[in-house]
């Protein structure tokens, strides 16, 4: 006799709770691992060990005839490994950089429910900190609140996998004395959010931030005669649509934010790319020390001469010192037509002797060189088998 669906679901619930208990135990062991590495001074990330672990788990499941696909096993344990790595990084960083104020003040673009707000919450949760939300009307205001000390940190979007670089943030970095102290990647899932039951054929006006509009351009072009209203943030768009309460308008934003304003989801997954991710940076008034055991990035701002090959000569310094460059972005120099400055992101800690030597050599090939920040690489690249 077949089991009742309710009985099956009860068994699943019991198994899920057992899984949660085991995951919690594994999470706690990550602290034992990092304390051991703290004594031995071993590197935090051990890619060979991670690959070996995945291979052993896949083989074990096959030997035991668990009927689980290798890809399924690796995807689950890649996430578990990522949690372990980030947990260990946070432990070391908190020991190096004591935060006197337990209630952090974090500035971000928009109101509650904006993507920047959700990213700020994610960052605070990672470091297990309570925080006071400081919503801002512009990226410039985020910088100002940190500069004046009103905020401990500012969280800003730097680039998106669909729309590319956030040029306004890059340009503000040119003129700030703030330091980059962190990064995080946040998955972006745009939705059409409305007040009440309606359908897409009724929608004639869409509200959202320009970046969101750009990231959903293909979906928007598929609609007939729709008008775009640009807002200072996606949360501001949601607030407007909620307050206007009309059946012919919609906001483009995230589902969690929509719930805060009483909006319903009309359509999901409307971004041009399915895997739509925004990389956020975290800025502070003072730099934060990064443990030598942690994978680290450094962002530089540089200008070179206008001679042929000047940029190539500068970049060869990193090749000489075997330093990997993860980002090269150019922006115009205001007041100097056709001249550009370059943002370079490298996988290196500025306190490492080899990095110090490379930066000294780089000065010989640059007219201007500024270190914008050195921070933990918190985007964990998954290993594969």
UniProtKB/Swiss-Prot annotation:
Concerning Pfam families, the annotation shows:
CM_2, PDT
Domain Chorismate mutase: start-end pairs = 1-92
* Annotated EC: 5.4.99.5, 4.2.1.51
The pathway it acts in is: Amino-acid biosynthesis; L-phenylalanine biosynthesis; phenylpyruvate from prephenate: step 1/1; Metabolic intermediate biosynthesis; prephenate biosynthesis; prephenate from chorismate: step 1/1
* Molecular function in Gene Ontology: chorismate mutase activity; prephenate dehydratase activity
Q: Where is the ACT domain?
A: 299-376
The cross-references to InterPro entries, in alphabetical order and at most eight, read:
ACT-like_dom_sf, ACT_dom, Chor_mutase/pphenate_deHydtase, Chorismate_II_sf, CM_dom_sf, CM_II_prokaryot, CM_P_1, Preph_deHydtase
Is the keyword Transmembrane in the record? no
**Where is the site labelled Essential for prephenate dehydratase activity?**
278
* Lineage top rank: taxon: Bacteria
Residues annotated to bind substrate: 9, 26, 37, 46, 50, 84, 88
Q: Name one GO biological process term.
A: chorismate metabolic process
Q: Which reaction does it catalyse?
A: chorismate = prephenate; prephenate + H(+) = 3-phenylpyruvate + CO2 + H2O
Q: Where is this chain's protein located in or outside the cell? A: Cytoplasm
What is known about what this protein does? Answer: Catalyzes the Claisen rearrangement of chorismate to prephenate and the decarboxylation/dehydration of prephenate to phenylpyruvate.
Q: What is this protein called?
A: Bifunctional chorismate mutase/prephenate dehydratase
What is the gene called? pheA
């Amino acid at each position: 006799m077949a089991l009742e669906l309710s009985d099956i679901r009860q068994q699943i619930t019991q198994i899920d709770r057992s899984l949660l208990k085991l995951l919690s135990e594994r999470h706690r062991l990550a602290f034992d691992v990092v304390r051991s590495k703290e004594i031995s001074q071993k590197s935090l990330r051990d890619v060979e060990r991670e690959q070996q672990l995945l291979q052993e788990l896949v083989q074990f499941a096959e030997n035991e005839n668990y009927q689980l696909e290798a890809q399924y096993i690796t995807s689950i344990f890649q996430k578990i490994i990522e949690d372990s790595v980030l947990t260990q990084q946070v432990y070391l960083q908190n020991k190096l950089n004591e935060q006197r104020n337990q209630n952090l003040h974090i500035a971000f673009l928009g109101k509650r429910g904006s993507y920047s707000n959700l990213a700020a919450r994610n960052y605070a949760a990672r470091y297990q900190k309570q925080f006071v939300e400081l919503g801002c009307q512009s990226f410039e205001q985020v910088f100002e609140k940190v500069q004046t000390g009103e905020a401990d940190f500012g969280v800003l979007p730097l680039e998106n996998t669909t729309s590319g670089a956030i040029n306004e943030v890059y340009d503000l970095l040119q003129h700030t004395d703030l330091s980059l102290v962190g990064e995080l990647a946040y998955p972006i899932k745009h939705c059409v959010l409305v007040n009440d039951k309606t359908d897409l054929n009724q929608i004639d006006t869409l509200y959202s931030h320009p970046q969101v509009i750009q990231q959903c351009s293909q979906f928007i072009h598929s609609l007939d005669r729709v008008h775009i209203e640009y807002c200072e943030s996606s949360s501001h768009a949601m607030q407007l649509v909620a307050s206007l309460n009309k059946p012919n308008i919609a906001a483009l934003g995230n589902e969690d934010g929509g719930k805060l304003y009483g909006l319903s989801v009309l359509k999901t997954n409307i971004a041009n790319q399915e895997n739509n991710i925004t990389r956020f940076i975290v800025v502070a008034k003072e730099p934060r020390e990064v443990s030598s055991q942690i994978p680290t990035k450094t962002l530089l701002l540089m200008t070179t001469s206008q001679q042929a090959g000047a940029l190539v000569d500068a970049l060869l310094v990193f090749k000489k010192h075997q330093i990997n460059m993860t980002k090269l972005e150019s922006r115009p120099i205001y007041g100097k037509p056709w001249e550009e400055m370059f943002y370079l992101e490298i996988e290196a800690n500025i306190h490492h002797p080899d990095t110090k030597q490379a930066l000294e050599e780089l000065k010989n090939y640059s007219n201007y060189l500024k270190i914008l920040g050195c921070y933990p690489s918190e985007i964990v690249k998954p290993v594969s088998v």
